Amino acid sequence: MSLKKSPFFELRSGSVDTLLFIVKTADLDALRAELVKRFEATPEFFADDVVAIDVRRLADNERVPLDDIRGMLSDVRMRAIGVVAQPEQHAWAAGAGLPLLEARDRRAPSPKAADDAPAQPEEPRVPAAGQAALFAQAGPSGADAVAPPAVAAAPVVAAQSATLVIDKPLRSGQQIYAKGDLVVLGPVSYGAEVIAEGNIHIYAPLRGRALAGVHGNHDARIFCTCLEPELISIAGIYRTTENPLPADVLGKSVQIRLEQEKLMIEPLRLT
């Protein structure tokens, strides 16, 4: 076989980030009801986004019909492109015709392993995706809290990639991804998306989506001078406009951080 390069196509190793739809129950009726509850009012929210179905949270004796789950996701306009599974799940997970994918995070422990393990602070969860990291660990719920005002100071984190600075407005449909921290000097419009593996700083209104710590960094934070978002997410734990923000943070300068797997939204003192 000739090794000469073709001018028409090329095959090379690569990786693609995507959403993880983490299945935590084998009860399809409950799963379907929750999907409808969360997304029927905003069917365009994840319109045409691709996802990988993650079944690693299921118990050893649990199986789910992946074709049915693929259909559920299609109903809310998400497209399943593969399955993430534990090695012992590969035999049945591969039967749906979807490719088995490797996640770049720590593997989610099985329920049995979690029960046997000693109590300790929860490890960072499955990182989500290059376009939306944050799906399925937590959603828009009353558990998200608004905390008392905090001093505007970013946490000290390990050095990552260089900070990416965007000095132009982001319009609907635009997406920015930063391997480290991300600084945005212009407004993030509805339908625009900013994603970072580190912290996100937005010195203008945030009206689109902001997703920090997308590879499981629970110490990442979001800083914003005017909070009016479609979605905010840190390490996959997210909140949407389906759960309205309190008046003391809506449209205000805030920082957003994680505490005990909950999003804390804190007004900032900037003067």
UniProtKB/Swiss-Prot annotation:
UniProt lineage: Bacteria, Pseudomonadati, Pseudomonadota, Betaproteobacteria, Burkholderiales
Protein name per its UniProtKB record: Probable septum site-determining protein MinC
Pfam families membership: MinC_C, MinC_N
Function (record text): Cell division inhibitor that blocks the formation of polar Z ring septums. Rapidly oscillates between the poles of the cell to destabilize FtsZ filaments that have formed before they mature into polar Z rings. Prevents FtsZ polymerization.
Cited InterPro entries: CAP/MinC_C, MinC, MinC_C_sf, MinC_N, Septum_form_inhib_MinC_C
Annotated spans, Disordered: 106-125
Assembly information from the UniProt record: Interacts with MinD and FtsZ.
HAMAP family given in the database record: MinC (MF_00267)
Native source organism of the sequence: Burkholderia thailandensis (strain ATCC 700388 / DSM 13276 / CCUG 48851 / CIP 106301 / E264)
